[in-house]
Amino acid sequence: MYSIRKQPRNFQRKFNSNTTNRFPIRRKYVGGHTRPSVRRRLTYEPVERPLVHNVLCEKQHGDVFNLQQNTSYTSFVTYPSRGPSGDGRSRDYIKLQSMSVSGVIHAKANCNDDPMEVSHDVNGVFVFSLIMDTKPYLPAGVQALPTFEELFGAYSACYVNLRLLNNQQHRYRVLHSVKRFVSSAGDTKVSQFRFNKRLSTRRYNIWASFHDGDLVNAGGNYRNISKNAILVSYAFVSEHSMSCKPFVQIETSYVG
């Protein structure tokens, strides 16, 4: 004879319960067709442009860069601004890849009333330096960046290997420096220089970050940089009355 198989006590409750439904409800429409339920997201995260490689070209020249003997001027490398248009950077940080620097120096002896005073050659030393500022900061109301003397000491440091003062080494680091000996006998002498500097390597990357309160204030100037700004130091020393006019182009390769 056939035996009757017993069902578990919760069999009816399990399959007759209205609270258990593992599959989405399909609604029926006219014509017998059915359409599955659609899940809609109520909030969306902003879409950010992926990081791309780019090069920013900047030229530094003009009256503020013109140097007399035993003077200096400090500038900075402008970083890209942030914007949704696709130009510049897409984040509040960039990876610094490399820098390509080229320029010319126009050196000339300052002519006096007596032309016999400039009949002999006069000479001087021009120094161009890239300096990493790991913690950029300017107090409120201060516009001037650190001078050559504040970073390296007396101008006589131009004649030897540049070395930061002990009290500046915790914040600054010399990336590269170029020296050019120039001479003139009244006419203008032109000297050229060029170099490439690798910043990030396979083992070590250099990142620069920004404050970026909003897109309106998301530029690449020194005050908006919160980490790893690059200062540009121009210095010219001479024992004679001379002037030096540099024209420099800086190409910064970055990912951002």
Swiss-Prot record:
Pfam families membership: Gemini_coat (PF00844)
Compartments where found: Host nucleus; Host cytoplasm; Host cell membrane
Gene3D superfamilies (UniProt xref): 2.60.120.20
GO molecular function annotations of the record: single-stranded DNA binding; structural molecule activity
Membrane topology summary: Peripheral membrane protein
Annotated GO biological process: DNA transport; transport of virus in host, cell to cell
Motif window: Bipartite nuclear localization signal: 18-39
Motif Nuclear localization signal location, chain numbering: 81-96
Keywords carried by this UniProt record: DNA-binding, Host cell membrane, Host cytoplasm, Host membrane, Host nucleus, Host-virus interaction, Membrane, Transport, Viral movement protein
Chain intervals for the UniProt region annotation (Interaction with Arabidopsis thaliana NSI protein): 150-187
A cellular component annotation (GO) from this entry: host cell cytoplasm
Principal location: host cell
Top-level taxon: Viruses
Function: Binds to the genomic viral ssDNA, shuttles it into and out of the cell nucleus. Begomoviruses use 2 proteins to transport their DNA from cell to cell. The nuclear shuttle protein (NSP) shuttles it between nucleus and cytoplasm and the movement protein (MP) probably transports the DNA-NSP complex to the cell periphery and facilitates movement across the cell wall.
Subunit structure: Binds to single-stranded and double-stranded viral DNA. Interacts with the host nuclear shuttle interacting (NSI) protein. This interaction may allow NSP to recruit NSI monomers to the viral genome and thus regulate nuclear export of viral genome by NSP.
Family that this chain belongs to: Belongs to the begomovirus nuclear shuttle protein family.
Protein name as catalogued: Nuclear shuttle protein
